[in-house]
Amino acid sequence: MAAAPDLSALEARIGHRFSAADLIEAALTHVSAAQGKRVSYQRLEFLGDRVLGVVVANMLYGAFPDADEGELSRRLADLVRKESCAEVALEWGVEAYVRVGESEKQNASVNRAILGDVCESIIGAVFLDGGFAPAQRVVTQAFEPRMRSPRRPLRDPKTTLQEWAQARGLPPPSYRETARTGPDHAPEFTISVEIAGFQQAEARGFAKRLAEQAAAAAFLTREKIVEPGDRKGAA
């Protein structure tokens, strides 16, 4: 099978360097891609869901001393729902690293749900790798900003990039497959994205759609674009 993209960049975005590489590998593997000795993220997701709930509940308890149990429960449910976890996973850029089977690669809605699961599985992996303190730090870094400020739903990177280009009168982003490695049953794609007047960005993923999203995310990061109209990109 093709080698996974460099995990050090992902670890830097998560905020934890893994001592046990098998934990982060498992956290990124959907059950549809678990074959032979490869373990899926299901058990880690179960654990991460509980760790996430405890850390966020503790954050809310300290941040809102006048809130009653009902308000705290509503805030907790909003922060730890799958959509919120998927947003965190997108911010971490996990879509380029997730391993899924062929049956899942073309299902965008399932992949969105998978991203939420992977966020929780990564939290579980951090907990097993380093204990509660590192897991608390990772969760706090990712979820505390959501707790303290209302926000618009995070768009996927391809949509954000296309809207950014359109708002500036630029041609739409152009995606191109530049390499394909690995066996036929588990290929890894390298995709580049280009907008006229800008340097292309490139990323890898275990499905074309995921590699395109990762390339768009790389472009957005390099040009310091958050949402169209929210922050100016390069001139």
Swiss-Prot record:
Record-given protein name: Ribonuclease 3
Compartment annotation: Cytoplasm
Species this protein is from: Methylocella silvestris (strain DSM 15510 / CIP 108128 / LMG 27833 / NCIMB 13906 / BL2)
GO biological process: mRNA processing; regulation of gene expression; rRNA processing; tRNA processing
CDD domains hit by this protein: DSRM_RNAse_III_family, RIBOc
Binding site residues for Mg(2+): 45, 117, 120
UniProt keyword terms in alphabetical order: Cytoplasm, Endonuclease, Hydrolase, Magnesium, Metal-binding, mRNA processing, Nuclease, RNA-binding, rRNA processing, rRNA-binding, tRNA processing
InterPro entries listed in its UniProt record: dsRBD_dom (IPR014720), RNase_III (IPR011907), RNase_III_dom (IPR000999), RNase_III_sf (IPR036389)
